Amino acid sequence: QYYGFELIPIPMDDNGPDMDIVEKLVSEDESVKGIWCVPKYSNPAGTTYSDEVVKRFAALKPAAKDFRIMWDNAYCIHEISDTPDVLLNIMDECKKTGNEDLPIMFCSTSKITFPGSGVAALAASENNLKVLREKYNYEIISYDKLNMLRHVRFFKNYDGVLKHMEKHKKILKPKFDIVLDTLDKELEPAGIASWKKPHGGYFVSVDVYDGTAKRTVALCKEAGVVLTGAGATYPLGLDPKDSNIRIAPTFP
């Protein structure tokens, strides 16, 4: 948006993005240069892309030769369920289809340690890494190696990261349970809204009648409950149906 890109919202279902629309746009229009994906516990509904969706991403035939899939795995280990979702490895699938240059994958510890002072990771093909390294040479002289060392000494290894996430889960799951139990008790009998019960991530997505989300958020604010602005998770902040409300059990 900041750089002048036209942002096109893609409808989502329980399997992820509508791949018929994605494939049509990507294969027919060379001005379509990329797609941004949060493949696990995706905002706002907490959806994890199905195996079929990941495989269809890996098999894309873009009209634009420089088309890239931005695979933002922000919630890769952010579980709140004892039966966490499993996401297929897109790079493995892209290798099978000869599309290794398609995905650029990244994640960070911003929701694990401290936002803005964590550690980020990026994975891509050698071709993509070569381009990215060249650009980073002009952006930063040296990385914050002391912060990297802090994280290594704190976590020690991958098992240490998972053990730390169990502590997050103990804090977050009761909050999610309160929100979901309240929705079940107060709204389900009225039949005026629907929601999903995510296995992870940081949010609960509630869908109300079309054209009423902004008004609902405004009424909640008048009652003393401040919610995330309606449409916040959509490109340009515009929910085409004005029906989605994102609830953050993590705050407070």
Label every model-predicted segment.
Residues 92-173:
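Conserved core segment of the aminotransferase class I/II
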Residues 166-180, 192-207, 221:
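Conserved glycine-rich beta-strand-loop-beta hairpin in the small C-terminal domain of fold type I
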